[in-house]
Design a protein with these regions (language model features):
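Bacterial N-terminal signal peptides that target proteins for export
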Residues: 1-9
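Repetitive helical segments and hydrophobic/amphipathic motifs
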Residues: 12-13
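A residue-level marker of the well-folded mature domains of exported/periplasmic proteins
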Residues: 23-359
Length: 359
């Protein structure tokens, strides 16, 4: 074989090797720079990315995936419900490989968009959209809210406990109901008004801090000294009102939701007993990872609770909540995880709930 032919064959082998080195991996990314980056899109509800709660947690999960898998990411904030479908359309048009809709209010928009774009993968949080290209993530909020109720029931001195919800509907009712069941389990006297909804306020908003402040003031005027919220940005207003009351010499406490709000709102850490951790970030991270790994399962619904590690209490709880109370919370948490306690999730179930004492 002559030298020219040997040289040509060698060059071909090298070129082939280099080309193979740039071949795409299963996740759509390429080794060596010839990359088709997976793109992730997300639209919030009107609470916005910086609600220090639900939407921010969703955003955190995708940012973790960005760091680990080097995916592209584009979030869009909705200002009103009218933005939902157009935001989803825009994310599809931008080339997103998976689009997340954050919140039950987007069910109708997601249903319409999933039909329009059958080849695009979608995920929605807090409701079920039964479409072959949509995975639905739901949480057992009542379980974590029950634990917050145990804390509230043990910490109240007035035996009056309040709840502020974003909107009076099935999802947010799960927070209210679980919370009332937890209070009733450790302090039945403090649960009476809560169960009768005498100390329950729905702001009909997830973003108006003024409404949260007004609601908290009204509850404190009724004698409530512990208030739990499931209202997104409205909860910031609740904390503002409680802080002002604390500054005026009143012993009043707030309980946060979705993220550790003593961390996301450090200026109110001194008046927060605990927060119910709802790992929305786990759902958005796992949803993104499923696309990266090629394991996306559309047409499925995933339910996440204490047993799945997606519901918990804030790690900062020990700052303002005594150890004996937190020890009791852990016992209830174990009982729920082991199936010894089934926490009610509807107002009707709450009526027939029989408290279970753990020791």
């Amino acid at each position: 074989m002559n030298k020219k032919l040997i040289s040509s064959i060698s060059a071909l082998v090298v070129a082939t090797t280099l080309f193979a080195g740039c071949a795409k991996t299963d996740n759509g990314a390429a080794k060596g720079g010839d990359t088709k980056t997976i793109k992730v899109g997300l639209t919030t509800d009107e609470g916005g990315l910086n609600d220090k709660s639900f939407n921010q947690s969703a955003d955190t999960g995708i940012k973790k995936a960005v760091d680990e898998f080097k995916v592209g990411y584009k979030p869009i904030e909705a200002k009103t419900k009218d933005d939902y479908e157009s935001n989803l359309d825009a994310l599809v048009a931008d080339g997103s490989d998976i689009v997340f809709a954050i919140g039950y209010q987007m069910e109708q928009a997601m249903t319409a968009v999933a039909d329009k774009y059958p080849d695009t993968k979608f995920a929605i949080i807090d409701t079920v959209v039964d479409k072959k290209n949509v995975v639905s993530y739901n949480f057992k909020e009542q379980e974590g809210s029950f634990l917050m109720g145990v804390i509230a029931g043990k910490m109240t001195k007035t035996n009056k406990i309040g709840f502020i919800g974003g909107k009076d509907q099935v999802l947010i009712n799960r927070f209210e109901v679980g919370f009332a069941a937890g209070v009733e389990s450790v302090n039945p006297a403090a649960a009476t008004e809560l169960k009768n909804r005498g100390t329950v306020v729905y702001a009909e908003s997830f973003g108006d801090t003024t409404l949260g402040k007004e609601a908290a003031k009204n509850l404190m005027n009724k004698g409530c000294d512990v208030i739990y919220h499931a209202a997104g940005g409205v909860g910031v207003g609740m904390f503002q009102a409680i802080q002002e009351a604390k500054n005026a010499g009143k012993e009043v406490w707030g309980i946060g939701v979705d993220m550790d709000q003593a961390k996301t709102l450090p200026e109110y850490a001194n008046i927060i007993l605990s927060s119910m951790i709802k790992r929305v970030d786990t759902a958005t991270y796992e949803g993104t990872k499923s696309v990266v790994d090629g394991n996306f399962k559309g047409g499925t619904s995933v339910s996440l609770g204490i047993k799945e590690g997606a519901i918990d209490i804030a790690e900062t709880s020990s700052k303002n909540t005594p150890k004996d109370v937190l020890d009791l919370v852990e016992k209830y948490k174990t009982a729920i995880k082991d199936g010894k306690i089934t926490v009610p999730s509807t107002l009707e179930e709450l009526k027939s709930f029989k408290p279970v004492e753990v020791k």
